[in-house]
């Protein structure tokens, strides 16, 4: 009798992170669209860590006052996670942390440097 193989979970973290990113984006759109600070936030990536216990959500904001945006996201994280638990089909809902993604700013600085060469 052949041995039963374990399912390949190598991409499970990516699937969970992607699902969390999609759901949190929906939650921000549905619940905070009239919030002046959060209405300009776009989630651009997610990474799961610690056996899927933590998900880092990377965001970009049109608002130039990133510390204010980060403070506002930190303030709503608990309510977002509560809403996330209601929308996810999982026994455990990961902790979430928002981090600013400065990739666009770095890319524009590199472009400016290359133009000056």
Residues covered by each model-derived region:
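Charge-rich, low-complexity N-terminal segments
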Residues: 1-54, 60-117
